[in-house]
Every structure is written in C-alpha cells, then in structure tokens.
Amino acid sequence: MNSHKKEEWEEISSIGSCNSKSRVLKCRKKNGLIENEKVDIVAVKIINKKFFKRNETDILEKIRLFNIPRYYSHAEDDNYIYIYMEYIEDKKQLRFKESEIISMIADLTETLSFLHKHQILHRDIKPSNIILDKNGVLKLIDFGSSIIDQQQDDGDNICKESSFAITGTHTYMAPEVKKLHRSTKKSDVWSLGCTVLEIVGGNPKKIFDGIPIIPNHVSEIMVDFIKRCLIIDPNKRSHMEELLTHRLISSMVGQNKNRENNIEPKFNNDYLSSKFPERFAPRFEKPKWEIEFNELKFNKDDTVGGDGFFSVVKKGYYNETEVAIKLIKKAHGENVTVCDTFYHEVLIISNLRHPNIVQFIAACIKFDNKEVNHCIVSEWMSGGNLSQFISNERKILEINPHLRVKILLDIAKGMLYSHRQGIIHRDLTSNNVLLNFRKKKLLNNNSSNNDEQFYDSDEIIAKVCDFGLSSNQSESKKLRGGSIHYMAPENLNGSPINEKSDIYSFGLLVWQMFSYASPNTIYSPKEMASMVSDEKLNYRPQIPFNVPLKFKELITQCWDRNPLNRPKDFSEIIDKLKDINQIYFQDNSNASTISSTAITTTISTISISNSGNSSYSTSDDSSTYGSGFYNSGFL
C-alpha cells in the first residue's frame, strides 16, 4: 500500500467532524492521480493521536467490499493520523420508495454479515454512519470504534479487547454493552435493529420495557425483522447470517439483488423523519397530499385563526377552497423537536377520514435551507373552537339544550373512530374541538321574544382536531403529554395509559358544557396536577347542582379515578348520550324543559374569560405538559 505525505494534498472543503476527536476533509492530490487508483480526490480523516486506535487502519486495510469506502493509505505526524479513503459524493435526497428502503436494509445487513465473517465488530452502527453515493449505493463508514475479534468464535463470546470500555452511541447501544461494557456480534445486531427502526420512521429513544417501541404504521414483515434484532437476551437475538435469510430481504441479497423482489411488503404510510443527518435523511415517494407552498393563497386581511408560541393558524385558499393553514413560525422552523412533532401530526391525520375529525387536505414540507415553510392545510371551521362557543354563545346552549347532546355525540363519534384506528388523542380539550354552525334564526312561534335563537341539531357540527400529541396505542403505554387540566390521574402519575385517558378528558368536556367554565380557570396547572393525582384528595371540579341526573352519572363515570370504572369505550358513551337524547329531548317542544338560565354554574368563584375573535384559540402555555410544544396541542 502506497504511503502519502500530507504535503502532497490540498484541501478543497470540510466534509464534517465525526466527533470532537476527528474531522474529515475533501482533498485533491497536487500532482496527478493516486497510483493504481485513477482518482485525484480523496476523503482524509484526521485523528488526534491521543484518541487513535490502530484497529481502524488495520480493519480498513484488511477489507474490500463494495459497501465500504476504499482505503488508500495513511500517514502521521507528531500530533495527528491522516487516513486517506475513497471520497463518496453523497446523494442528497429526502424520500425513498419502499423497494429502495428494503434494498438499503439488505445492503447494510449483508455488509455487517461480511464483517462478522471476518471477525470484525463495527460497534457504532447508526444512521449517521451510513451514506448513499450519487448512484444510491449504501456505504457504511466510520470504523473508529471497530475491533477485530481474535477468538474466531460463533459470535456469542465476548471480545476481550472491548471488555472494559463503552464504545458506540448510547441510543443505538445494546443492553449488554450498557450494562457490562462489553460487545459481541449480537451487539451489532441490536444496533442494526435500532437503525432500521429509525429508517422506517421510529424513534429508538422511545422505550418500553427496555425495548424501543415500533410504530403501528410499520408493516408486519418489517416488524418481525426489527423484533428479531431487538431482543434483550443476546443469546436469543438473531445472527446477521440468520437475518439474511429473513423473507424481507432474502430475495434481494447476492445474485438475486437485481431481480424483482417477490415479497413487496406494503408500508401503511409514507414515513417522515428529521432525525437523520442531511447526508442521509430518509426520503420516500412524494405522497399525494404533499404540495408546494406557492399553491396556497392567504386572505387579503391576513386573517389569523389562532396564534401560539410555535405556530400560527391563518385563513387561506387552496384550489379556490377556503382552508385553515397551520404554519410553524419561522423562528422554530429548524427546531428538531418542533419539526418532529409536525411530521408526527401529518403522519397521523393524513390517514384519518371521519365526519367528526377535522379534514386534513394537504401539507407542505419544505426542506430548503433558505426558507422553511412547514404547514398543514385543513378545512376551515367557521364556528371557532368549543371553548369560545361555550363562553361566547352560552345563551344558545341555554335555549337549545339539545345541542349539548349533538356536540358531545359528534366528539364521541370522532374519538371512537380514532381509537379504532389505534390512535389515542392525549390532548382532548375544548380548544381542540372545532365547530361549524350557521347562525340561522329559527323563530319559535310559541315565543314572544323574537331575539331568541333556536337551532336544529343539523345546524351545528363538532370535529376533533390537533393530533400533534397523539400516539398509537403501543407507544402510549408510558408516554405523558397533553393539557394538565384535562389530564387523567394515571397520566399525571406516569402510569400506563390507553384510550381510557381520553374518556377521562371527555368527562371534563361534558362538565364544561354545563358549568360554562374551563378547568384551567380554577387552579394553576401545578395545583391541578397535584390535587388530581393525589389519591386522597382525588379532586374534580364541582358539578352544578341542577345538571340532569343522567349527565351527572356520565360525568362521574368518565372521570372516575380508576380507568376500569370508566366506560369501556366511546361506543358505550354514544349509547348513553342517545338514551339521554330520547329521555330529555324527544321533540323540540320539550327542549325548554331543562333549558334557560336554570342550568348555570354554582361555582361563583369561576370567572369566564372571553377568548376573543380568533377561530382557533390557544390555552395557557403553562398548562401543557410533556414536550413543552403545545399550548392547545400544536398551537
């Protein structure tokens, strides 16, 4: 192998730093080509000698594989080691086809299997150590943590060289490495599982019972592959060779790689992720709902439907249709947490279709470094949110009490659909229910007061919105989040949650429909959290004394401390509301039997605040728990 002196090279640009101990430069040979290589441009990894491990050059010199950058030579001076390698002109793309994703997984698994056959452990497998060249070929890089296993065993024995040092990236590190500080070939298998999980839109940091949570949208065949990697006991974990025979990739490895794959697992969604570095951000075929920002038109008066810390909702037009446009504020457009939550909401709502869930229309996902225009486009709801309606249109509810049942039925139907899709809302509040209604005056012939407005149930429709904090049922086991005043005790205490937590929040909505107050006007978030979560205090707001008995029963059952005592699901709540409707509102003439000012709050200390003219309002910043991202959900 030819040696090279650093004086023979001129720096073109910085490619980046692998860590604080090394950096990589793009360089050109000053005089001609590298002998026998026919190239004049290389990647030079410069490593501080204090942190250099001879393993890296020994391994790179030993292996020759299409999916590993070619090693040319290395040099050194008093302070640094210079490793000269093949320069990879990476392919910058952000969306991949399903078949491309499977091909990448196959390439990565085959590469790792090759290394293990030669007794090499990589020990730092993660998305940032994978790049694609300009032809889309996967390359595994950064062998700074790698070692050669001298024991020549079956892969289960521990490598002596790694016995007393943690090496790798914690998020992708196998349990036995974290606990025992020791690596095996099976440790690479765990890291592979975490990497594949992230490629298909999961988050290895979200863990339950020691194992990263696999999102519901991942296909069964992909789930099986990942699960074979993510087994806590390394003795039960698959070998790389075994993974090569898995039906997900077996027909794409070796001679079959260029043949049409007989198994084409269908992903249920397009997967979105901002966790990867720019050189390897996963990209999939552009979904039908993705649009360009210039396709949107905004109202001339720049109507604002709601303004929050991280985003703003504006009224606009898409294809000459009135829409609500929720934009991430430019100051937060590059915030990873904000963008992740945005992508998460798009992923969920783009697959929900129900009359009582705000209709998602499109989204703009702008990755241009010069300008960030992330936005969600949905139907425009002219009636504002339920919190505003309760506060500003109290008289309508008093004159038309049957509308309470209609609104609550709409919410329950939307939530039932959501739960049956495996989605837990986790932030069901009056701010996250939007209304459409027409103030069409229907004069009551029996009424002498022509100012009274009477509505048919068909005149109003309620829809659930803001799924930014939502999660699938497998992910929600120990995740906390939402508006504290509506949060169930088990959520506040960090206990496992499920759809019963949404039912608890629904109980507070029913209470709010009669008290005309918001839970957050009574106590501060900290006080409310302490009082609700405390088993002895077990605080709930006071139910007005003249609320009809059936409604009282529904409220107390929904917000029962024990989730098992709450309604089994929203279908049971719907049945109860239908029964209430028949008992109290058999016809419009009976509507007045429990109407008028008789139904008022008995809590004199509660002050009702006017939410203003905004159609999409936000709640207090401090009432949101968990990610710190939402005021009322995403806003």
From Swiss-Prot:
Domain Protein kinase, residue spans: 9-249, 299-585
UniProt cross-references to InterPro entries, sorted A to Z: Kinase-like_dom_sf, Prot_kinase_dom, Ser-Thr/Tyr_kinase_cat_dom, Ser/Thr_kinase_AS, Ser/Thr_Kinases-Pseudokinases, Tyr_kinase_AS
Top EC class, one word: transferase
EC number: 2.7.12.1
Tissues expressing the protein: ZakA and zak2 are coexpressed in prestalk cell population, zakA is enriched in pstB populations and zak1 in pstA populations. ZakA and zak2 are coexpressed in prespore cells, zakA expression levels are 10 fold higher than zak2.
Domain of life from the UniProt record: Eukaryota
Active-site residues, record numbering mapped to chain: D124, D427
Signal peptide location: none
Residues annotated for ATP binding in this entry: 15-23, 45, 305-313, 326
Annotated catalysed reactions: L-seryl-[protein] + ATP = O-phospho-L-seryl-[protein] + ADP + H(+); L-threonyl-[protein] + ATP = O-phospho-L-threonyl-[protein] + ADP + H(+); L-tyrosyl-[protein] + ATP = O-phospho-L-tyrosyl-[protein] + ADP + H(+)
Keywords: ATP-binding, Developmental protein, Kinase, Nucleotide-binding, Phosphoprotein, Repeat, Serine/threonine-protein kinase, Transferase, Tyrosine-protein kinase
UniProt GO molecular function: ATP binding; protein kinase activity; protein serine kinase activity; protein serine/threonine kinase activity; protein serine/threonine/tyrosine kinase activity; protein tyrosine kinase activity
One GO cellular component term noted in the UniProt record for this chain: cytoplasm
UniProt-listed GO biological process terms: cAMP-mediated signaling; regulation of cell fate specification; regulation of gene expression; signal transduction; sorocarp morphogenesis; sporulation resulting in formation of a cellular spore
PTM section of the record: C-terminal tyrosine kinase domain is capable of autophosphorylation, in vitro.
Disruption phenotype: Abnormal morphology of the terminal fruiting body; the sorus, or large spore mass atop an elongated stalk of vacuolated cells, does not form and the stalk structure is expanded.
Record-stated family: In the N-terminal section; belongs to the protein kinase superfamily. Ser/Thr protein kinase family. In the C-terminal section; belongs to the protein kinase superfamily. TKL Tyr protein kinase family.
PANTHER family on file: MIXED LINEAGE KINASE DOMAIN-LIKE PROTEIN (PTHR44329:SF298), SERINE/THREONINE-PROTEIN KINASE TNNI3K-RELATED (PTHR44329)
Stated role: Positive regulator of gsk3/gskA activity required for cell pattern formation and a downstream effector of carC. The kinases, gsk3/gskA, zakA and zak2, form part of a signaling pathway that responds to extracellular cyclic AMP. The pathway has a role in transcriptional regulation; required to direct prespore/spore fates during development. Zak2 negatively regulates prestalk differentiation by regulating expression of ecmA.
Extra information: 'Zaphod' is a fictional ex-president of the galaxy with 2 heads.
Name assigned to this protein: Dual specificity protein kinase zak2
The species this protein was found in: Dictyostelium discoideum (Social amoeba)
Lineage start: Eukaryota, Amoebozoa, Evosea, Eumycetozoa, Dictyostelia
Gene (UniProt): zak2
